[in-house]
Every structure is written in C-alpha cells, then in structure tokens.
Amino acid sequence: MRNTNSKVRCEKRQLSKCKEVVKTYNEVQHAFADVLEKDASIREFICNYPLSDFPLTDGKYTTDFYCTTNEGDIVVYECVFRRHLTKPLTAKLLDASRNYWLRRGVEWRLVIDEEK
C-alpha cells in the first residue's frame, strides 16, 4: 500500500503487461513487477491502483498491484518489507486493505521480501 502523498524515490519504467508507466517505490515492488511481467497467468496489471472509499484514510492510498488473470479474475497484491510487518500502522493498513478487497470479492495476496 502506498500513500499518494509520500515523498519517496520513484523508479519509472515501461512493461508490456501494464498500459501505463510502471512506478515502483521500493525493491519489493520493483522485483514483483518483474515477476508479474513473466507470469503467463497474468494478462495485465495496474501498478498503484487508487482505492476509493477506503476506510482509515481520505482516499489517498493505492494498492500496489491490481492484476487481471487470463481467465478474467482480479487479484491484488500488497508489497511490504518483512521488517515492517510488526509495525502497528502497517498491520492496520494491510488488514484494512484485505477487508476492502475481500468485501468486493477480489482475491488479496501479500508479497514479502526474502528473509535474510
């Protein structure tokens, strides 16, 4: 999840499965965009998909990846560093994101960086 007001470094690039410029804000998000690009079951994806009517915020948050599979199903992915999982705000936002998407009948998945 990303707050649209955050002022962090953004890497921009073009990938064939994303119609817009792919903007990634950390290593986990960058690496997972490559995974989605190579995944044969993913038809297309949107990076930093805006959340409307999202609880806890004023609508300024995005889901990291909103994906459409070849079967037409929607799957969303949130990317997070392992060290941030224990932070109360991160846990609260991830839980809210999961509930937001599950209420809409969308499969929700979490992507975590490798353990070192």
Which ranges hold each PLM region?
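Electrostatic, structured charged patches in enzyme active sites and in nucleic-acid/phosphate-binding
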Residues: M1-K116
